Amino acid sequence: MQPKILIRDENAFGASGHSGKRLSPSWRGATHIVKLWDQNEYPQLAANEFFCLTAARKCGLDVSPYRLAEDGMALVIDRFDLRMDGTYRGLEDFCVLNARRTDEKYRGSYESQVMKRFTQFANSTHVNEDMEKLFTLIALNCAIRNGNAHLKNFAIVYDDVHGEARLAPVYDLVTTSVYIPKDCLALTLDGSTKWPAAKDLRKFGETRAGCTPAKVRRIFQRIAEALQETSREVNSYAQEHPAFAEVGQLMLREWDEGVNASLRG
C-alpha cells in the first residue's frame, strides 16, 4: 500500500489576509495529494514518478501540476478533479467502469477493458482526441516499462452525469522494472502480458484507437523524443543528487530498451 496524504492549501481559492502557503492535512476540500514511499523497498520512487510524469507532459498528455520535494522523498500533485469553487468533478476509474472490484484491477485487456470501454462512456465531442491520448499513454507505459498500468490507473472525469466525459489527466506513472526486473504489462495486449513489439503496438493503435499508420508513427516519434529530452534532465538531477544516480541509470536503460523494442523494433 502506497501512503498518500491529502492536504489543503488554504490560499488555493483566493483567500485573502494570508501571506505564504498555509497547508493542512484534510480529506475535505483537499487541494493536493502528497505521495510517500518506503525508501527501503522502492528507493527514489518519488523522483522516478516525477520524471515519468515529465515525459508524459512532453508527449503532449494532460498532467496535473506536480513537484518533487527538495529531499526527493515525496511527490506533491495538484488534484485534477477540483473545481475553482472548491467542489469536485466526477471521477471514475476503469475498475468502476468495468464493474470490477479493486482486487480485480489486473484482470482484463487494454483492447476491451480500456479502449473499448472508454468508447462506451466517452460521450464528448473530443472522443477522437481522447482516444489518441489514451493510445499515447498506453504506448508510453510500454516504452518506460511501467508494469502498473492497471484498471485503476486510467480514469474519466465529468462535470455532470449527463454531460461529456473526458479522459482524466495522467497519474501513477512509474518505471516499475527498476524494482521488478521481470515485470510485464499489467493487462494483456494481443492476449499477452509481454512487452509488445512495435508491430503489435502499431496494430493496436490502428485497430483500437482508430489512428492512421502515419499518426501512429508520429505518436511513437513524439514519445521517443520526449524520453530523450527527459533523459537529459534525469542525468542532470542524478549529478546533483548522487543518491538517485543508480535508479536514474536503471531508468534510462529501461527507457532505451522500451523505445527500441516497443516503438522501433
Regions found by a protein language model. Name each.
Residues 1-151, 155-265:
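Anionic ligand-binding catalytic core segments
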